[in-house]
């Protein structure tokens, strides 16, 4: 049996993503491509599903929130994704530009890749941009780093197995640090070390071996 080697997928870190968001790009084509990429980062939707997204896929809930309901082209899995402020702004920005009821005009993959390469260079990101990377960034940067459970991420990304989601969602050092801060707050004052009679000077003076011999001698005396 051949052992599977885990794949280390790249996702944008917070600094890279902020550079991308705030960049003033020189042409409409680059701005449009950047916005499609950002939409993917905030929704986890890949290029193929983005191209097929229509107004009928946008559902308004009773509380007024808007959601994307789609079946992924690749797996046919149902995905329900809440639209946050930035993707809602992007939809409004490009309203009416898509054909046949589609939300967006999405260029061919080769043209997108060419534009993404230029954007990455102009923003000094130090990495290549792809829509696979956008999905990884959705799982890690947008969801997991902000406390969204991996089961929920898996459902939104249209995965049938959480193991697949684990490939996309990577635990960052920032996430670990924040989780441990929460753990520290939640356990503060809940536990106490009992007084076992061991003098603290034993450890301060490094005289543990001598203290241990005293205890053993005392135990032997009690047994006699």
Feature-to-residue mapping (PLM):
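C-terminal catalytic core of Y-nucleophile DNA break-rejoin enzymes
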Residues: 6, 73-92, 98-118
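Basic, Lys/Arg- and aromatic-enriched nucleic-acid-binding interface segment
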Residues: 1-47, 97
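C-terminal secondary-structure termini that scaffold catalytic or DNA-interacting sites
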Residues: 183-224
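Catalytic-site neighborhood detector that most strongly recognizes the C-terminal catalytic loop/helix
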Residues: 3, 11, 72-76, 109, ...
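Short, charged phosphate-coordinating catalytic segments
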Residues: 15-16, 40-64, 151
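C-terminal catalytic core of tyrosine-transesterase DNA break-rejoin enzymes
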Residues: 38, 42, 48-49, 118, ...
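Short, polar N-cap/turn motifs at the start of nucleic acid-interacting alpha helices
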Residues: 57-64, 126-127, 147-167, 174, ...
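Short basic/aromatic active-site micro-motif
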Residues: 32-34, 107-110, 126-146, 159
């Amino acid at each position: 049996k051949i052992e599977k080697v885990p794949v280390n997928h790249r996702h944008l870190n917070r600094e890279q993503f902020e550079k991308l968001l705030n960049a003033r790009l020189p042409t409409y084509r680059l701005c449009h491509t950047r916005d499609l990429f950002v939409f993917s980062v905030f929704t986890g939707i890949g290029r193929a599903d983005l191209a097929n997204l229509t107004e009928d896929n946008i559902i308004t809930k009773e509380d007024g929130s808007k959601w994307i309901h789609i079946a992924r082209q690749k797996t046919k899995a149902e995905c329900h994704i809440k639209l946050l402020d930035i993707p809602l702004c992007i939809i409004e920005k490009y309203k009416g530009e898509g054909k046949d009821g589609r939300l967006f005009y999405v260029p061919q993959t080769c043209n997108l890749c060419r534009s993404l390469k230029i954007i990455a260079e102009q923003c000094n990101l130090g990495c290549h941009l792809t829509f696979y990377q956008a999905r990884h960034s959705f799982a890690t940067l947008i969801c997991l780093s902000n406390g969204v459970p991996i089961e929920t991420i898996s459902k939104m990304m249209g995965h049938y197995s959480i193991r697949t989601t684990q490939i996309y969602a990577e635990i960052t050092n920032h996430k670990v640090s924040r989780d441990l801060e929460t753990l520290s707050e939640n356990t503060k004052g809940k536990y106490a070390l009992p007084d076992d009679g061991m003098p603290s000077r034993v450890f301060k003076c490094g005289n543990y071996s001598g203290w241990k011999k005293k205890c053993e001698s005392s135990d032997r005396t009690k047994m006699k």
